[in-house]
Structure formats: C-alpha cells, structure tokens
Amino acid sequence: DFENKQLSAATAITSGQPMLAGEEVFPVIETVNALPEVVAALEKRGVGEGNGLCLPRTVGRFFSNLADPVNSRLVRFDCLNIQGQSGLEILPTTSAFARPVEGLSILVDVEDATIIELSDSFAEGGAPPSDFDVIEFHEGALQTRKPLSPVRINQDEGVNFSISGSQIEWQGWRFHLRFDPRQGTILNNIGMTTETGMRPVAYEIAMSEMFVPYQDPDQHWFYRAYFDMGEYGFGNMASELKGHDCPSNATFQSVVLHTAVGEPFTAPNRICIFEFDPGYPSWRHYESLYAGVPGIETHHSRRATHLVVRMAATIGNYDYFQDYIFQQDGKIRIRLIST
C-alpha cells in the first residue's frame, strides 16, 4: 500500500524461483573450494593448493533424480586452473577462464550449502591436463600494435537530444527509459511527433531473454543451457561503462538496483546515450538522366545521425553490449554485440 507505506499482504509463490544472487552463492563458493574431496581431485590433475577455483552454474530443472529442482536452489560447480604469473594478490592469473578442469562437477543446494553430488569422471586417473601455459591478459603482458592516429568525436555545439527525468526526445522521437534487474534497459511509450500529435510506435521494447545452450552431451556439460536474463539478470550483471565503452560525447546515467534482501543502492554509469555518424548517408541518389544538363545537380545525399542507448552486461567470461538505435528515417534497431 503505497499511500499508507505499509505491507498489506505477502503471498509465497511456489511456481518459480528468483534469479541467482551473489549474496547467497559467495559463502557457498568458499565452502566448496575448501572441501577435501575437491582439493584432492584438483591435486590429482596437477592443480595445487591456491591454483584451483570452482564456480557455480545454474542448472535449470535438471538433476530432478537427485533433488527437487523447484524447492531447492541447485547450482553445479565446475573448476578452473588459475595458476599464473599475474602479480595480483587475489588471483594468480588474469586469464582465469582459459584452463577449465574437465571431468569434475559438484552439485550443491545453496539454500543450506548441502553437497548433493560430487562427480569425478577421472577418479582413477587419466584426466586431461589443465596446466598448459596461457597468455596473461593485461597490458603489461601483451604485445600491442603501433597506436593509431586519433579519431576524435566532438559536439562543440552540444547534443541534439533532451532528457527530462526518464523521458528522452530526439529528432521527433520520444520515449521513456528505465532499468530492470532482469532485462536491463527497457524503453516504454515510444512514439514519433507529427503535425497532428504523438504517433505511438510501441508501448514497450526490451529483450525478454538470452538463451545460451552449449549442446554438449558430456555428463559435465549437458546442463549448461543458461537463461542469462532469467537466471542471472542482465541488469544485475551490468557493469559500469568507462574507458572506451562509449564515445567521448556520451551522456551517462546511473541506475538504482537492490540487493537480494531488497535494499536499494545506486549503480553508477550503467547507461550511456550518444549520437554518432554511422559513416553512410541516410539517403543518396545519382541521377544519370540529367548528367550534363546545365543547372541541374545530379548527385544528392543527406548525412545520417543515429541516437544510441547503450548498456553492457558481463556474465561469466562474456561481455555483451545492448544498443537501442534510433534513426531519423523512423527506424529503430536493436543490436546485441558480444565482445
């Protein structure tokens, strides 16, 4: 009850589960990595103490033969060899995902940190090696090309869009922008201004889900078919935009998210809004019929400018850019980029 600022009813929903939250898995990560059975299995594979890291993955409705997937919070851990020469105090390597440890999985109920199953396909030996060399992924360890001459973007006369609260207007476009823990950026009430008023285009534009099926029948891989939005949350996994994530003429917005227990917090610079020249004209025509006719221009072109609303989500070892692109000719494009 918003008027009286009080809770009027609370009903438990048993038909689904909320997204995985960091607060519930972080303690379990420590527990699993300290298990003597896990430490021993890693050592048999040549992964010494402090050089192994096991992380949880969602499992959907799999493993119903071992536990109730509806009323349990099941995750399955797989492990990585993180041995390296990064010079970091926290992790020995900056290429943590480069060396997966195959044939070892731990099924856990994070509700009470119960270890349901430890599956080791190479308990008797013969595991594939995971101690091969990797390239450390930081500037000091990588050879880089000669720097490019700078390509600069500037808008000396200011931007062409306006922001009023959560409403954005640009070149006749008007829309409401909000941010959701599951879906990330969401556009509402999108319309185009005309001589007779606002022409509605869409009530809502948003990504509903991202499904990532690995499609490997191996017993340690078959369950890896992730719903990145429903299980992890594009908004929850959104990372701060900085560096070269957005061009220098971008406007940044922070968003309000909440913890697993509902406490709000501000997440800085999760959205950027900018205009850019796509490098091709919005319209171009050459009329050969009038070539050579005095006083008639045979070539015509109009410069294009697009408006972009961008966010970036980092899910495991994947980084995704989600762009909503508005064009002057009335088109809206949705672009998802995996970097």
Where do the model's predicted regions map?
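Beta-strand/loop-rich accessory regions of lumenal/periplasmic or secreted enzymes
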Residues: 15-339
